[in-house]
Amino acid sequence: MSVEDGGVPGLGRPRKARWTLMLLLSTAMYGAHAPLLALCHVDGRVPFRPSSAVLLTELTKLLLCALSLLVGWQAWPQGTPPWRQAAPFALSALLYGANNNLVIYLQRYMDPSTYQVLSNLKIGSTALFYCLCLRHRLSARQGLALLLLMAAGACYAAGGLQDPGTTLPGPPSAAATSPMPLHITPLGLLLLILYCLISGLSSVYTELLMKRQRLPLALQNLFLYSFGVLLNLGLHAGGGPGPGLLEGFSGWMALVVLSQALNGLLMSAVMKHGSSITRLFVVSCSLVVNAVLSAALLRLQLTAAFFLATLLIGLAVRLYYGSR
C-alpha cells in the first residue's frame, strides 16, 4: 500500500511504529483541543482574543521549526538557501487564513448545529481536489469510506454529546445555548460552500507543494509559518481595540497553544509523507477523543449518536485501509 493511497511510509517496523505513534498523538491533540479551550473559560467566556491564540500558535510553530534547523535535527540544504521556493507558501498561508476567518463569519448566518453538520462537506471537497490536483483515483471502497466518514461527522455533530441539564442532544455549545432554531441563510449557504472548497484546496495544495519541493520539512514549515505569522499579526493588529496579546492567558491556554503548535508540525509531516486523506481520518477519529474527554472533564453525556458515529468511523477506516 503506497503513501499516496494512505499507507504507511516505509516498510520497516521501527518506521511504521513511529508513523503510527505520530498519527495517534495527532488524533489525541486534535480531540483535546475543544475540551482544553472549555477549561480556559472564565465566567462562561473565553478571557482572551481568539486572534491572540492563533498568532501565538503560529509563532510557536515558527520557533520550533527554526530551532530544529539550528540545532541540526534536520539538515540545512547545501548551497544558497532556496528562498525563491518560499513564495508558493504565501498562498498556503492565505488559504488557511481565509479558512480560519470564514469559520467566524459563518456563525452569523446559521446556528452552531447546522454549521457542525454541514461543515463535514469539506471531506468531499478534499477528496475532489485530491483526485483533480494530485491525479489519484479513489476506488469504490475508498469513496464509500469517505461517505461513511462524512456521515459519522454529521451524526456526531447532530447529537453525539448531551448536557445532563438539558434534554436537547447536540454539540455542547449548541446545547448550552438552546433553544436556537435550526436555520441557515442563502448567504450562509454560499459561505459554507466556499469554506468547504477553501478547506479542501488549502490541504491538497499544501500537500502538492511539500511533495514537489526537495527541501527539508522543517525548512518548508519555516516558509509556511513565516507567512502565517505575518498574516495573523496583521489580522490581530487590525482587529481593533481589545485585550492585549497575553492578557487572559493561563496554564490551560499555554497547553492549548503548545499542543496545537505540535499538532500542526505533525500534520505537516502527514502532508509530506502521507496524504490529505490521511489527515481527514485523523481529524475524524479525533471526534472519539473529543467525546471521551468532554464526558470526563466537562461532565457531558455520551449519546447513542456518539456510538453510531464511532461505528461508522471504524467501518470507514476498515474500508479505506483494509485489504483490497
Curated annotation (Swiss-Prot):
The UniProt record lists the keyword Membrane: yes
Topological domain ranges for the Cytoplasmic compartment: 1-18, 74-85, 163-180, 236-248, 299-324
Topological domain ranges for the Lumenal compartment: 40-52, 107-141, 202-214, 272-275
Membrane disposition: Multi-pass membrane protein
UniProt keyword annotations, A-Z: Golgi apparatus, Membrane, Sugar transport, Transmembrane, Transmembrane helix, Transport
GO cellular component: Golgi apparatus; Golgi membrane
Molecular function terms from GO: pyrimidine nucleotide-sugar transmembrane transporter activity; transmembrane transporter activity
Record keyword Phosphoprotein present: no
Reaction(s) the record says it catalyses: CDP-L-ribitol(in) + CDP(out) = CDP-L-ribitol(out) + CDP(in)
Principal subcellular localization: Golgi
Gene Ontology process terms (BP): transmembrane transport
InterPro entries: Nuc_sug_transpt
Localisation: Golgi apparatus membrane
Cited PANTHER family: NUCLEOTIDE-SUGAR TRANSMEMBRANE TRANSPORTER
Subunit relationships: Found in a complex with SLC35A2 and SLC35A3.
Protein family according to the UniProt entry: Belongs to the nucleotide-sugar transporter family. SLC35A subfamily.
Protein name per UniProt: Probable UDP-sugar transporter protein SLC35A4
Gene encoding the protein: SLC35A4
